[in-house]
Amino acid sequence: MSKLALLVLEDGTVFRGVSIGADGVSVGEVVFNTSMTGYQEILTDPSYSQQIVTLTYPHIGNTGTNSEDEESSSIHAQGLVIRDLPLIASNFRNEQSLSDYLKSQNIVGIADIDTRKLTRILREKGAQNGCIVAGNNLDEALALAKAKEFPGLKGMDLAKEVTTKEAYQWKQGSWTLESGLPEAKDDSELPYHVVAYDFGAKRNILRMLVDRGCRLTVVPAETSAEEVLALNPDGVFLSNGPGDPEPCTYAIEATKVFLEKGLPIFGICLGHQILALASGAQTVKMKFGHHGANHPVKDLERNVVMITSQNHGFAADEATLPENLRATHVSLFDGSLQGIHRTDKPAFSFQGHPEASPGPHDAAPLFDHFIELIKKHSA
């Protein structure tokens, strides 16, 4: 017999379902993601730290899980909410069922609830704090109290919590259907030395940089600009990550130094927001954020529309852009800023996820633009 579970939102709404993960209590900001596939990549994306993820697609878990699709070394989401967990996981790459995967990492999950109703609540009221309780003691009052006690992500610096503890080299390229994950490339195949700040970096971002000839030195979030400059990089990459960008003063100040030095800079997600803050713009907390793999974004410079992968709850405020920042991309869902480019420095950033994983690859040429800036700077 399945164990029961409940999800309680801070507004008092209660959802009862069945447990699909570990027993226990988990608290976080409840968000919804509209991706139809890629649940393992979503769960292991460090950007979901302190968030409970609701997947709007009704059937989740069909293909199981495997060690190659992880975007980090562990699950970072606080919990998982789905409509239906299939009885059987069927895929030639399957190594472990989704339920067993959650249990193995002590992550709570709940299924058999009305995820459409939950999503409508989050859209209308905004992202809410919530608490999942799974197991034998389903105490609604306790869950509600814990949801209300959660401080929320505004003002929360999570990048330094999920970052690597020590610097390391990354030389592995992208997975292919024919051969799986490749061996690390030789330095002779990687002409560009890029220092990548790990604010919660996804592995597929690193792989796509390696595919384009980058030898990566991945450094902790609080690494000083002086330490990075001592490595003599050809460019600096600012990764994705969780939480509020404003408290990341260490990263903002370091980025200011790189801008002054004229180093090529590319930022994604949190890295995009950090570049904006370092350039004098401001950021805002969004009502319910963008989380999904089907978000249309307009490229203002090429006048084309891209379908993109998105995962962010904060955004750079276009109204605060200084004269040396040019808006390059906007969301066609709500008009929010999606990309910027410094007019006076070789620096640019994108709010969405051009590496996808999961999602489309329409924005992948942004990685090529970074390489072009590095080549021009090195010439």
Swiss-Prot record:
Domain Glutamine amidotransferase type-1: 193-379
Enzyme class: ligase
EC number: 6.3.5.5
Coiled coil (UniProt feature): none
Disulfide bonds: none
Metabolic or biological pathway: Amino-acid biosynthesis; L-arginine biosynthesis; carbamoyl phosphate from bicarbonate: step 1/1; Pyrimidine metabolism; UMP biosynthesis via de novo pathway; (S)-dihydroorotate from bicarbonate: step 1/3
Region (CPSase): 1-189
GO molecular function per UniProt: ATP binding; carbamoyl-phosphate synthase (glutamine-hydrolyzing) activity; glutaminase activity
Catalysed reactions, semicolon-separated: hydrogencarbonate + L-glutamine + 2 ATP + H2O = carbamoyl phosphate + L-glutamate + 2 ADP + phosphate + 2 H(+)
GO biological process: 'de novo' pyrimidine nucleobase biosynthetic process; 'de novo' UMP biosynthetic process; glutamine metabolic process; L-arginine biosynthetic process
Pfam families the record matches: CPSase_sm_chain, GATase
Catalytic residues of the enzyme: 269 (nucleophile), 353, 355
UniProt superkingdom: Bacteria
Keywords tagged on the record: Amino-acid biosynthesis, Arginine biosynthesis, ATP-binding, Glutamine amidotransferase, Ligase, Nucleotide-binding, Pyrimidine biosynthesis
Chain sites annotated for binding L-glutamine: 47, 241, 243, 270, 273, 311, 313-314
NCBIfam families (UniProt xref): CPSaseIIsmall, PRK12838.1
Function noted in UniProt: Small subunit of the glutamine-dependent carbamoyl phosphate synthetase (CPSase). CPSase catalyzes the formation of carbamoyl phosphate from the ammonia moiety of glutamine, carbonate, and phosphate donated by ATP, constituting the first step of 2 biosynthetic pathways, one leading to arginine and/or urea and the other to pyrimidine nucleotides. The small subunit (glutamine amidotransferase) binds and cleaves glutamine to supply the large subunit with the substrate ammonia.
Subunit structure: Composed of two chains; the small (or glutamine) chain promotes the hydrolysis of glutamine to ammonia, which is used by the large (or ammonia) chain to synthesize carbamoyl phosphate. Tetramer of heterodimers (alpha,beta)4.
Entries under PANTHER family matching the protein: CARBAMOYL-PHOSPHATE SYNTHASE SMALL CHAIN, MULTIFUNCTIONAL TRYPTOPHAN BIOSYNTHESIS PROTEIN-RELATED
Family affiliation: Belongs to the CarA family.
Protein name: Carbamoyl phosphate synthase small chain
Origin species: Vibrio parahaemolyticus serotype O3:K6 (strain RIMD 2210633)
